[in-house]
Design a protein with these regions (language model features):
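Terminal and linker regions of secretory-pathway proteins
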Residues: 1-211
């Protein structure tokens, strides 16, 4: 989005125009998935939406969890954070497994792409899980939408727009609320609304400090 200072593509570029067209098609496929609620409808929607909307961004060479950074997959790993490999190495040491009571046969993985692929081929990733939140909010369960401006994968603008359109008991209050800077021992850059969302300024995935 051009309203995000970290946008990857120029608004008038061919890439953006293609993304707009793909977004419209993705929305239609998602509607069919939501209506039919079947693998036959949801898997094609999932594959098309992820491929057409995330594909161009993946080709830029930036870290999609923090677009201010470049990503060298050979050096930084599949998900652009070498720390994840370090954690895997530590947790797969026999001594650590023994202390934690983990069987030798189990290998720890920071992110299991095989499981990810299985979710994708069930069409789960494209289904509207927001339906599950509405009754929780009505029952008084608190929800915090927490996003970093520089995170492409969990896009702050998209999350905010979703929160403002999401039908729930706080819908009117959230839309009428104003964004106010949040201070916690100094300015944080976050601008929460009283009823709902927090966008963490200048941060990446999970608003990871120093990302």
């Amino acid at each position: 989005s051009p309203s995000n200072k970290y946008h990857l593509f120029e608004p008038e570029s061919d890439t953006c125009q293609k993304l707009e067209a793909s977004s419209a098609m993705c929305s239609k496929l998602m509607e069919v998935c939501d209506k039919l609620d079947s693998r036959l409808a949801c898997v094609p929607a999932s594959l098309f939406c992820w491929g057409s909307l995330y594909g161009p961004a993946q080709q830029t060479g930036v870290n999609l969890y923090d677009v201010r950074r470049q990503c060298d997959h050979e050096k930084d790993g599949e998900l652009c954070y070498p720390e994840m490999t370090h954690i895997e190495t530590l947790l797969n040491k026999p001594t650590v497994k023994s202390q934690l009571g983990v069987p030798d046969s189990i290998q720890f993985e920071s992110c299991n792409m095989q499981v990810n692929g299985q979710f994708m081929l069930q069409g789960d990733s494209i289904q509207n899980s927001a339906k599950l939140l509405e009754p929780l909010l009505a029952d008084g369960v608190r929800v915090l939408a927490y996003a970093g401006e520089a995170d492409f994968m969990c896009n702050a603008i998209g999350i905010q727009e979703w929160m403002l359109q999401f039908p729930n008991v706080y819908h009117e209050a959230l839309n009428n609320a104003t964004q106010t800077p949040l201070f916690a021992r100094g300015p944080t850059g976050a601008k929460p609304r009283l009823a709902g969302d927090v966008i963490k300024a200048g941060e990446g995935h999970g608003a990871r400090a120093g990302a």
